[in-house]
Regions:
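Ligand-binding pockets and gating/stacking loops
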Residues: 1-409
């Protein structure tokens, strides 16, 4: 955001800004690209003076806890390639997700819960597809893939015993299956057989750990009030934020929350407000909650999407309505917690918020920085596959963004 952007409303985006850059097929045929001024009020908050929208008042209130990165960028311009890219470090399918990489590299301190858990909530906007490969293990051993917790019914499918099967009989069945699997492993030395044995055992232990984890009756009323009106509604973002904190307390090292609905090609003024209502209070509450419990210094909270949106209107621009197309050239994310510099604003874009003019942060740079916070050198964190030492940050190279790190982490 820049105050001068309000003067640009309705004027054509100069061709020099686009400079022949690729845009989506949804707007490539437009004859006019009128700029749209910010639809909401922005004010500066915190010691950093970062600008926050009026529809994110709770995130604005933690401005001094976060680093605001205004120069994130990606080459992808459509949803699935972009989500795949930011999760796996490449637009090509078949690569491990960040959670799988970290599960592989760091392991999990919990014997009773997976090392990587995914939860999905749905906003009130249109929902793009989310494929299970986004939390998959790719070419890493399959034991490192994420486990999706469902928003209704059984959190994990087939975890509960079917009618007529007791815990004792389930134990006996597993022992018999494991004996067969161990014999097969002795014959073939296939590591995936060991993975299967371990996953069966984990599922058995989760029959006790998951019900305890997902029972929010033990949470006091003030916690629900802190997270907002949806905090008691399964499947909502606020509910998932509380579950995420409980997972972290129980030793789950990597929790990923997807909130769908951020695709306002039309009806921006209405739908963006609704989406922000879903996430603003819970996201800020999670940071505060972790801090109050002494957990924030050991936890990294990352909030953002796969790309930004254009300054120009998609379709006609009217007094009350407009849309915005995908824009990967620059967008904003924020981070908080262990190793992250507090109250900092990083990066700058041009007057049209179309291109980055200072301190660009590619998504692979962002992932390299997260690994640094976890004590991992992203260049040495590799897995040999197809003749290459594969990395989460890609084989082309990435850099740690030291400017958003606390001083103690710059030289690990």
């Amino acid at each position: 955001y820049k105050p001068a952007m309000r003067k640009l409303h309705g004027i054509e985006l100069p061709d020099s800004m686009r400079n022949g850059q690729r845009i989506t097929g949804m707007t490539s045929g437009q004859k006019s690209f009128p700029c749209v001024a910010p639809m909401f009020e922005f004010k500066q908050h915190g010691q950093s003076g970062g600008y926050f929208s009026e529809i994110l008042p709770n995130v604005a209130s933690i401005a001094d806890e976060i680093s605001l990165i205004r120069s994130v960028n990606t080459e992808a311009i459509n949803h699935d390639p972009a989500i795949t890219y930011i999760n796996t470090g490449t637009q090509q399918l078949g690569h491990p997700s960040m959670g799988a990489w970290l599960n592989y590299g760091l392991g999990s301190p919990s014997d009773n819960l997976p090392g990587y858990i995914v939860m999905i909530s749905k906003g009130r906007g249109g929902s793009q597809a989310l494929y299970s490969r986004l939390w998959g293990s790719g070419f890493l051993p399959s034991k490192h893939q994420g486990v999706k917790f469902r928003s209704s019914g059984e959190p994990v499918l087939y975890l509960n015993n079917p009618p007529g099967i007791t815990s004792g009989s389930r134990r006996a069945i597993l022992d018999s299956i494991n004996a067969i699997n161990r014999a097969k492993f002795e014959e073939t030395q296939d590591s995936e057989i060991q993975t299967r044995i371990a996953q069966y055992e984990m599922a058995f232990r989760m029959q006790a750990s998951v019900p305890e984890l997902t029972d929010l009756k033990t949470e006091p009323d003030h916690v629900f009030e802190q997270y907002g009106k949806d905090a008691k509604s399964p499947g909502k973002f606020a509910y998932n934020c509380i579950l995420a904190r409980r997972m972290l307390e129980r030793g789950v090292p990597f929790v990923q929350l997807f909130h769908r609905g951020w695709d306002q090609h039309g009806n921006c003024p209405r739908d963006v407000r609704r989406q922000c209502e879903d996430v603003d209070q819970p996201a800020a509450a999670l940071v505060r909650d972790l801090k109050q419990r002494g957990m924030l210094e050991d936890t990294i909270v990352i909030c953002g999407g796969e790309f930004g949106r254009t300054i120009y209107s998609q379709g006609s621009l009217t007094k009350d309505n407009h849309g915005r197309d995908h824009h990967g050239r620059c967008f904003t994310m924020w981070m908080a917690g262990g190793g992250i510099r507090k109250g900092h604003v990083h990066g700058e874009t041009d007057d049209f918020s179309y291109n980055i003019v200072r301190d660009p942060v590619h998504i692979n740079d962002l992932n390299a920085t997260v690994l640094q916070c976890l004590g991992i050198d992203h260049e040495r964190f590799t897995y040999r596959y197809q003749g290459l030492d594969q990395r989460l940050t890609g084989v082309q190279g990435a850099r740690v963004v030291n400017e958003i790190l606390a001083l103690s982490l710059i030289h690990i």
